[in-house]
């Protein structure tokens, strides 16, 4: 793993000259990518901050406390060769494919203010708005366009170190999202939310 990381890390300056290590995964294997995240979080130099970009082939990623049988339509997953993996952080199940880009920040958390998910999500929304995409941070951990989610985010905290990761759906297959994820009845209180597909969207159609 260490040799692989040495081949794919780069450094760039941000926040007035502070060095952040950039890691771009060469793999679309979900097991590899989640292992890479954990390795960087647990084993890499804690004096450094890290930013990762990665993609998974067709995969459902469930939160650390979720029941896979409750969250995933296993028949659909098997038929479509969709992997099911568990991440370190909590939160809900999300679908990944190559139309989705995942990002991860790993840094030291000085106090509770560093755990505010909006600190990570708001710059993404602002960047998209600068491109005339009407993105908004809403709820506890989502970024949406016109009320439809395109980014889910979650965090993991251990010994003063925080991992924040999220999804960016550019051109994911929304029909698969609807088929493979089970949604509890309380998610459908709004009459506008007729299906999973009705509540999610891609970024690409809104880009100029």
Located regions from the model:
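Long, positively charged amphipathic alpha-helical accessory segments at protein N-termini or as interdomain linkers
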Residues: 124, 131-132, 151, 159-208
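Beta-rich nucleic-acid/ligand-interaction surfaces
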Residues: 137-154
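Active-site loop/lid in soluble adenylation, ligation, and acyl-transfer enzymes
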Residues: 17-69, 155, 180, 200-208
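Membrane helical hairpin/interfacial module
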Residues: 50, 56-59, 65, 82, ...
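Active-site cofactor/substrate anionic-group-binding motifs, chiefly glycine-
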Residues: 71-93
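Residues forming anionic-ligand binding surfaces in small-molecule and nucleic-acid pockets
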Residues: 88-108, 186-205
